[in-house]
Amino acid sequence: MIYTISLNPSMDFIIEVDGLEKNSKNRMTSELRVPGGRAINVARVLRRMGMPSVATGFLGGHTGDFIKEWLNMEGIQTSFIEIDDETRINIKLYNKNIVINGKGPNISFNEQTELLYFISRIQEGDTVILMGSLPPNVDKDILDRII
């Protein structure tokens, strides 16, 4: 099995505007919300290639529910650790090449431990894909502990 691990996934809110003027109300001409994050994108591509995978990592709140439901709707198996904080939202102004990334949720010690326990049960011969940024309060040594 292939496991894609997202420590700081997002809901990407992609909007298009005709113009962008400071100190003015700017109207969107289109909008789209999709699951985001490098490892989640890999899981989505694997699914399109007919390769099963399990998307895991941290998800919380309404945005986390949105991501999980979307992935399940696409036929991607999920096994995320539910967190108390809200999964981040990234804003992308499509035709202006502007990206504003949310910082991400705070992940408790217990939530981190739960993910590490899940990862410890991955079988030899399985593939792990770990991609993306770290949530703000997660120390980078978690990467060593995962590997």
Describe the predicted segments one by one.
Residues T127-I147:
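Conserved beta-alpha-beta core of the PfkB/ribokinase-like small-molecule kinase fold
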Residues R48-T127:
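Conserved N-terminal subdomain of the carbohydrate kinase-like
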Residues M1-T56, F66:
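Glycine-rich phosphate/adenosyl-contacting loop at the front of the ribokinase-like
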Residues I5-P9, F58-G61, I83, S133:
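Cofactor-binding loop segments of dinucleotide-utilizing enzymes, especially the Rossmann-like FAD-
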Residues G19-K22, L71-E74, R145-I146:
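Short, solvent-exposed amphipathic alpha-helical segments in soluble enzyme
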Residues R27-L32, G102-G104, M131:
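Glycine-rich phosphate-binding "P-loop"
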Residues S30-G37, E86-R88, N106-N110, D141:
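Residues at secondary-structure transition points
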